[in-house]
Amino acid sequence: MVKVAYVQMNPQILEPDKNYSKAEKLIKEASKQGAQLVVLPELFDTGYNFETREEVFEIAQKIPEGETTTFLMDVARDTGVYIVAGTAEKDGDVLYNSAVVVGPRGFIGKYRKIHLFYREKFFFEPGDLGFRVFDLGFMKVGVMICFDWFFPESARTLALKGADVIAHPANLVMPYAPRAMPIRALENKVYTVTADRVGEERGLKFIGKSLIASPKAEVLSMASETEEEVGVAEIDLYLVRNKRINDLNDIFKDRREEYYFR
């Protein structure tokens, strides 16, 4: 059995040092509860509701050379956990809404958000790395960010690439994802870990309700709408590595791709 966790927090806009301190405390709390994988919200270090692209460019960092990735690697080394966390990435003059994956031995990889939501299109470029699955040794973790959930192809692609767990850093403002993510878990026979934020930022209110969902569409843990907190759940990887739903049906082998896009 493996334990996974979400960190639900209220990042302060353009205050990375304060956000590092808060995140470290909550990651350590999850680690004390036995979590081996901890997922943080989208843009956990920078805040979300930017006013200008220049504002984002000033605070965004390189991956993995930047301060945020270094901070996460240090915490992962100190706690022995694996971390998936959302951050603003600077690559030359280009900005991405990204997630980094780190572990006790350092940097593992990154994902760049493919489906940008609303005003994010003013600041970031769509991701160009594809949907990625990272092998942690004891399990495989796929990553998607916030609005990616709205497109079922996102979770399906990660599942087809072998993800046991889908890590889902988010800054949710619409109410639908907490209802939809158990279905994403069910239809792909994976676990999902959605780490949302709370609070209000420059007039934009976030819904909280971070959750862990099972391949049976069970909600194993759900956070409140307002509080900073950690949620931990034990998961059974056997359930996600067997894609059969009965003796005659396998959700991947029964796919009829030749009819899906006509």
From Swiss-Prot:
Enzymatic activity is inhibited in the presence of acetone, methanol and metal ions such as Ag(2+) and Hg(2+). Is also inhibited by various thiol reagents such as DTNB, p-chloromercuribenzoate, p-hydroxymercuribenzoate, iodacetamide and iodacetate. EDTA has no influence on activity. Disulfide bonds: none annotated. Optimum pH is 7.4. Active within the pH range of 4.5-8.5. Keywords: Hydrolase. The active site is at E42 (proton acceptor), K113 (proton donor), C146 (nucleophile). Its EC number is 3.5.5.1. Substrate binds at V173, M174. Residues 2-237 form the CN hydrolase domain. InterPro entries: Aliph_Amidase/BUP, Aliphatic_Nitrilase, C-N_Hydrolase, C-N_Hydrolase_sf. The keyword Hydrolase applies. GO terms for molecular function: hydrolase activity, acting on carbon-nitrogen (but not peptide) bonds, in linear amides; nitrilase activity. Optimum temperature is 80 degrees Celsius. Active at a broad temperature range (60-90 degrees Celsius). Highly thermostable with a half-life of 25 hours at 70 degrees Celsius, 9 hours at 80 degrees Celsius, and 6 hours at 90 degrees Celsius. Shows a Tm of 112.7 degrees Celsius. Homodimer. NCBIfam families: nitrile_Arch. Nitrilase that hydrolyzes preferentially aliphatic nitriles like malononitrile and fumaronitrile in vitro. These dinitriles are converted to the corresponding monoacid mononitriles, showing the enzyme is regioselective. Cannot hydrolyze compounds with a nitrile group bound to an aromatic ring or amino acid. Its biological role is unknown. This is Nitrilase. It comes from Pyrococcus abyssi (strain GE5 / Orsay).
